[in-house]
């Protein structure tokens, strides 16, 4: 298994155009933090802020996945857009790209909730299964990718499981930072009122009612 090179992380620029210096809010508490621990937390916060603005670098450093130029462009442009539509050729890797983006956002943003919707529950579960295989390093064509860092952040609520739930209500997982991902089925009446980011896989085949409820 290829391990993440810590030298790459240490060589990150100290300041980035999207960072605001060292203006990090420190919540006052009953037990004051030592200056050494506070300095360590600030380094982590600056690292998080840098990667939030550079998702392609994050995917390369933490998942060891080198995207194609077109894929990297899609990730960078779609990263902070409220609505994104991808129209790509067959074999572009749309579903895999979606999964990589979900994994990156789950790790970089706290309480990031994502729902995967498709025309049928099985199709959404297939997209989820690809994400699960990425986390378990079970995709032969992506030689050298490392999903162990992402998998280590998944909450394991059942001692006999690995954190990935395959319930009849939808496949799901949650991270320690509060991020959550779940698949949706075609029963739209049970999904009204849910809040979060929705990913439509093969959205061209969804009916109007499903699009209006999920969106």
Region roles according to the model:
Residues 2-215:
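Phosphate/NTP-binding elements of NTP-utilizing enzymes
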